[in-house]
Amino acid sequence: MEKNMVDLSKRRWFTPNRQPNQSQVRLPWLARPDAFTDECTRCGKCVTACETHIIEKGDGGFPNVNFSMDECTFCYQCAQSCPEPLFVAQSEAPWQAEVNITHHCLAQQQVECRSCQDACPEGVIHFALQIGRTASPQVNSELCSGCGACVSVCPSNAMTVHYTQHIA
């Protein structure tokens, strides 16, 4: 690691046994998200294929994305490993998402923290300076890929990724 670089994984030491603060997130690139539970055979191949290990078996054995430990790199391995025709092409957008910041955010409690901004690969999270207050996080939702990089590094579990719709 370069000198003066922040090791974001060390920030996880402050949040042991944390529970994800988000609703159920289905896999990216689903052709028909509303029919996913009817068409998925729950074989688990996507779970083992995921390079960041964020896909896990959820309710009923159906795969879900859990951002509490890492982010989606959009490697497309989940889709390539699936024996069923559930996914659209990788050239399509994986989903539409927006990041929500809850009241648990340290910056909103006047504690300086920019973990989410440091982790965001698209740079969609920035902090607006305010006179007499800690800088406030702002998200450009239109540019957010929904990768979840901001979720796992947040020491107060204040970040959630909400999927507005999957794109087919």
Region roles according to the model:
Residues 1-168:
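Non-ligating segments of multi-cofactor redox enzymes
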